[in-house]
């Protein structure tokens, strides 16, 4: 007999690891998965305030929350993530690779003209946005294989698919770093590669959001909306909707796919 929608949506008691948990999207994902009854392993850079996020969630929900301060540029620190999983849960149902340097990250030689983009920052972005996801999947595979509902979700970007239209950035302090696009494109291919290698025990999919509204300059927002059929920028909730779908049994026969959440940006 087929499952009901409520049963397919039920992920209460499952364990989810979210990287970049303190970012805007990471916080929204953490709250949403908590609301659905998941136990959480929240990972972010040691300089972020993971404890504050835990307190915020604990005021609303009673699930178990483990915090892992981790510099994703450090292979040694990534290896230590397994120790926390083993100690606290010894299994994993959902891995969301969300951490990344993004276009607005405050990095030297990052969101600037091509001529001024730094090779050192390029390497750092590849390390955090792509290599760390590979390493985490590699390390957590043994825990995910214990689950009968294992799902990996990689957070990509429309700029892993499309080239940028630099005209929307004119006369703003914004730009589109090459390393961001390239690292996200690599993450999408990693998704496809892992989906066949880890099948049938583990599903692997990605979500590619378009631009999310973050109080960008008014002129940029107007230009962005003009190019978007649904006539608005995205929100964290738009990403959460796709992530919930991929976390639950609603998507139990979906793997190797990239869900583009961009308000129609790419269909012109």
Regions found by a protein language model. Name each.
Residues 2-7, 164-167, 171, 244, ...:
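Short C-terminal tail/terminal secondary-structure segment
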Residues 22-24:
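Conserved glycine-rich cofactor-binding loop
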Residues 38-52:
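Conserved glycine-rich Rossmann-like NAD(P)H-binding loop of the short-chain dehydrogenase/reductase
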Residues 80-87, 106-127, 223:
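Active-site Tyr-X3-Lys motif and surrounding loop/helix of classical short-chain dehydrogenase/reductase
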Residues 98-110, 264:
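Conserved NAD(P)H cofactor-binding loop of Rossmann-fold oxidoreductase domains
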Residues 115, 119-121, 145, 153-199, ...:
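Catalytic loop of short-chain dehydrogenase/reductase
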Residues 149, 199-203, 254-256:
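Short, small/polar-rich loop/turn modules that mediate ligand/substrate recognition or access, typified
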């Amino acid at each position: 007999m087929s499952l009901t929608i409520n049963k397919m949506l039920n992920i209460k008691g499952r364990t989810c690891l979210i990287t970049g948990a303190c970012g805007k999207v990471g916080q929204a994902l953490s709250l949403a998965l908590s609301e659905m009854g998941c136990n959480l392993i929240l990972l972010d850079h040691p300089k972020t305030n993971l404890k504050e996020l835990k307190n915020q969630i604990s005021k609303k929900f009673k699930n178990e929350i483990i915090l892992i301060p981790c510099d994703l540029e450090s292979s040694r620190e990534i290896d230590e993530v397994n120790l926390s999983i083993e100690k606290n849960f010894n299994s994993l149902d959902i891995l969301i690779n969300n951490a990344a340097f993004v276009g607005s990250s405050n990095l030297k030689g990052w969101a600037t003209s091509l001529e001024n983009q730094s090779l050192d920052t390029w390497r750092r972005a590849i390390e955090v946005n792509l290599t760390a996801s590979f390493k985490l999947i590699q390390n957590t595979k043994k825990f995910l294989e214990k689950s009968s509902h294992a799902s990996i979700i990689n957070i990509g970007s429309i700029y892993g698919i499309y080239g940028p239209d630099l005209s929307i950035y004119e006369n703003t302090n914004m730009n589109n770093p090459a390393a961001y696009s390239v690292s996200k494109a690599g993450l999408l291919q990693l998704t496809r590669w892992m989906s066949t290698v880890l099948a049938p025990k583990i599903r692997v999919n990605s979500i590619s959001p378009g631009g999310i509204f973050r109080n960008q300059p008014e002129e940029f927002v107007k230009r962005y909306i003009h190019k978007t059929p649904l006539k608005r920028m995205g929100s964290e909730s738009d990403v959460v909707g796709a992530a919930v779908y991929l976390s639950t049994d609603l998507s139990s026969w979906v793997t190797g796919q990239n869900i583009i959440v961009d308000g129609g940006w790419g269909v012109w």
